[in-house]
Amino acid sequence: DAIVFGCGSPGTMTGLSRFFAKAAPHVELIIADPVGSILTQYVNEGVLSTKSGSWMVEGIGEDFLPDISDFTRVKKAYAISDKESFMAGRELLTKEGVLGGSSSGTLLAAALKYCREQTAPKKVVVFVCDTGNKYLSKMYNDYWMLDNGFLEREAKGDLSDLILRPYAKRDTVVVSP
């Protein structure tokens, strides 16, 4: 009934649009887009912004609209924050054992938002389009997530609140003169 995908270059979206227009015109095309990209506003409001933000999710999102773009069949776009993307990707690993990358987290988060808005059951396809093996030091690293404000530490009210990487856990790098 629907397919959720991301746009790094609109080639995939244009190809899907043309294919489903002939093969299954009832299938709804939904874009998962990082917050900061111009695509969500363009799809949902028809406004092409000249200002884009920045995002940490890799491989999807646009700061301009390439000439090849054909958004005529796209029903809706969802802007997903970096935190939502990373947390969805981590949840995909812990609950399903699938090591997807950051853009897969964006697609999953958008698909869940789309599904929650529906009033009748639908079949929804989402691709895990990138592997998480290149994100082991990023979205799958708790310290990186903490350093970038995507995870919160529980305050204990003692010195451990100031020491992020305890020596006892062999997480502290010590260099002697």
Feature names for model-found ranges:
Residues 112-129, 137-149:
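Catalytic phosphate/nucleotide-handling subdomain of diverse soluble enzymes
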Residues 21-100, 139-177:
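Active-site/ligand-binding loops adjacent to catalytic centers
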Residues 6-17, 39, 103-111, 135:
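Short glycine/serine/threonine-rich phosphate/pyrophosphate-binding segments
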Residues 1-4, 75, 122:
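Conserved acidic residues
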Residues 5, 79, 101, 126:
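Redox-cofactor binding/interface segments in oxidoreductases and associated redox assembly factors
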